[in-house]
Design a protein with these regions (language model features):
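Active-site loop/oxyanion-hole signature of alpha/beta-hydrolase fold enzymes
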Residues: 52-59, 94-135
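Conserved alpha/beta-hydrolase catalytic His-Asp/Glu region
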Residues: 30-31, 194-260
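Alpha/beta-hydrolase fold catalytic core
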Residues: 1-65, 88-90, 129-130, 321-325
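Catalytic histidine-centered segment of alpha/beta-hydrolase-like enzymes
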Residues: 300-309
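Gly/Ala-rich beta-loop-alpha elbow adjacent to hydrolase catalytic centers
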Residues: 136, 140, 144
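Conserved HGGG/HGGXW glycine-rich cap/lid loop of the alpha/beta-hydrolase fold
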Residues: 53-102
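Conserved loop-alpha-helix segment in the C-terminal half of the alpha/beta-hydrolase fold
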Residues: 267-300
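Flexible "cap/lid" loop of the alpha/beta hydrolase fold
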Residues: 149, 158-191
């Protein structure tokens, strides 16, 4: 017979876990009610993909813009200030990366960053897009670079907004393998503890994300920030982080491909006050490693698509116009 103390402890743990799960479920549904889908879905071999598709190319030579958000982001990071402006001259497609926003992987598909790179080609084939310019913010920048390296005939240019270009810290292969083997742990955390904790700390976390810029008052709804409270989105972010070391090291090892003749043009914008990714270790380092033109900096933080849309639009237009020639 188990001791009374052990029985009480186990019962308390079960009650706490169920309470956290119910709380997470309620918060997830509330977030989805506040921030409903803003676009449409397409069925691809690997994913049921939610995207915003607006605008029309001003000429037959103009490429289509595909916008790729960062870690735990969603299409609203671009629809907040960028898409309407860009859609006046280009066809603009902003995607929810599977697991984020309202996109999801199909059953049996491995949830890898390389699969997200392959997704760019799937989108282009499905929508019959011949040449695209990729716009990547933060982790989305790394995915855009991976796609440019893998599909140079498809990608006509890359516009990077505060991109992740290499690992911020060194991760040992042993630690990376251990993290990859603990998916069950991330599932448990995302479905119980993570959402309630993030809800309590969300103001502080958002301030850190935007610093030193102010967080827009309507970021939670119009910027899609409340969707980050969903358990599925948190799990996708955990999986992205776990997969990042091995995948990004491989992408970095192929950066020389971006210096070869006929490679896609790469341009970059970085905030000198970025508190999430280092402008020097990520931006200046990459600009020196690869032929980045132009490489622009400004006095701003990390969330450039929401806080500095005019500068973002200018950079994207320059890349897209160059790809049209």
């Amino acid at each position: 017979m188990p001791s009374p103390f052990l029985s009480i402890t186990l019962a308390a743990l079960v009650i706490a876990t169920v309470t956290l799960w119910v709380t997470t479920t309620v918060l997830t549904r509330r977030a989805e009610a506040r921030v409903p889908p803003a676009g449409r879905w397409i069925d691809l071999p690997s994913a049921h993909l939610h995207l915003i598709d607006r605008g029309q190319a001003a000429s037959a030579q103009a490429p289509v813009l595909i916008l790729i958000h960062g870690l735990a982001g969603q299409t609203q990071h671009f629809s907040y200030r960028l898409i309407d402006e860009l859609a006046q001259s280009y066809r603009v497609i902003a995607i929810d990366r599977p697991g984020s926003g309202y996109s999801r992987w199909r059953a049996g598909v491995r949830h890898t960053l390389e699969a997200q790179v392959a997704l760019i080609d799937e989108i282009a084939r499905h929508l019959d897009l011949q040449r695209v310019v990729l716009v990547g913010h933060s982790l989305g920048g790394a995915i855009a670079l991976g796609a440019a390296i893998r599909y140079p005939d498809r990608v006509a240019g890359v516009a990077l907004l505060a991109p992740l270009t290499r690992l911020p810290i060194e991760v040992s292969p042993r630690l990376a393998r251990w993290l990859a083997s603990t998916d069950w742990l991330w599932r448990f955390v995302s479905q119980t503890i993570a959402t309630p904790m993030l809800r309590v700390r969300r103001q502080r976390l958002r301030a850190d994300l935007f610093a030193p810029d102010a967080v827009p008052a309507d970021y939670g709804v119009q910027g899609g920030g409340d969707l980050t409270l969903r358990s599925g989105q948190l799990l996708a972010a955990c999986r992205d982080l776990v997969a990042l070391p091995a995948w990004l090291d491989h992408v970095v090892s192929r950066y020389d491909d971006l210096r070869s003749p006929g490679c896609p043009a790469v341009a970059m914008l970085y905030g000198l006050q970025d508190a999430v990714l280092s402008p020097s270790l990520q931006g200046a380092w990459f600009a020196e490693r690869v032929q980045v033109s132009p490489y622009r900096t400004l006095d701003a933080g990390h969330m450039l698509p929401l806080t500095r849309p005019e500068a973002c639009v200018q950079l994207i237009r320059q890349v897209a116009d160059g790809a049209s020639r």
